[in-house]
Amino acid sequence: MKEKIIKAVVLGDVTIGKTSLLVTKKIGFPLEYIPTIFDNHYFEIKINDQIMRIGCWDTGGGEEYPRPLSYPQTNLFLILFSISSRNSFNNCETYWLPEVTKFLPSVPIILVGTKTDLRNCDDYKDKSTFVTYEEGLEMKDKINASAYLECSSLLNKGVDDLFDTMAIIGNNDLKSIIPNQLLRDHYNQSQRSEIYEAQRNNYENNNNNNNNNNKCIIC
């Protein structure tokens, strides 16, 4: 069986479950908060006797992360939001879609609602602001996404379905996508090294000053 490789970039606001989703798929749900500094996760998915290797680029959701560095040769974008965060949902259309279409307008998008377990969580008394499945479908049409899926990393529900969908959609777009001039000019190689090193040093300093051992994330 011939192996195909799909590059997927995972986008979304901070603390909405991007890293937890990928870690859950790989080893199970993480009990501690994992801050993101560019990380890659690889998965093998078998669809119709064909093995596809999906490389997921986990990006930070803050302004300080030079995300476009990870965009060249991308076959698929995942735009995530938390169903408990109306702001992260709205940002899919107002922030993340413009960024994606600015650099790689022809790459397919999968819209993903995370933390669906919170719909049945007693800790949330007022769920009137939660994003419904129907609203997710409407947003899919607004941003012209190829699919809308929901998942819970905590319950490991919908995660496998998401990756199967990624393999199917990504497989249909394995042609090499040449980044436009905006992307080529965004950062040169020296800037990449300086920015990445500054980010890592900043994270290590913050990690030494802040004890996050008791901080958990529900996904």
Curated annotation (Swiss-Prot):
Modified residues (Cysteine methyl ester): C216
Nucleotide-binding in keyword set: yes
Compartment(s) where it occurs, according to its Swiss-Prot or TrEMBL record: Cell membrane
Motif Effector region, residue range(s) on this chain: 33-41
Keywords of the record: Cell membrane, GTP-binding, Lipoprotein, Membrane, Methylation, Nucleotide-binding, Prenylation
Propeptide: 217-219
Membrane topology type: Lipid-anchor
GO molecular function annotations of the record: GTP binding; GTPase activity; protein kinase binding
Family annotation (InterPro entries): P-loop_NTPase (IPR027417), Small_GTP-bd (IPR005225), Small_GTPase (IPR001806), Small_GTPase_Rho (IPR003578)
One Pfam match: Ras
CC per GO annotation: cell projection; cytoplasmic vesicle; cytoskeleton; plasma membrane
Chief location of this protein within or outside the cell: membrane
Residues reported in the UniProt entry to bind GTP: 12-19, 58-62, 114-117
Top-rank taxon: Eukaryota
Any one biological process term the GO annotation gives: signal transduction
The keyword Nucleus is annotated on this UniProt entry: no
Family: Belongs to the small GTPase superfamily. Rho family.
NCBIfam families named in the record: small_GTP (TIGR00231)
Record protein name field: Rho-related protein racN
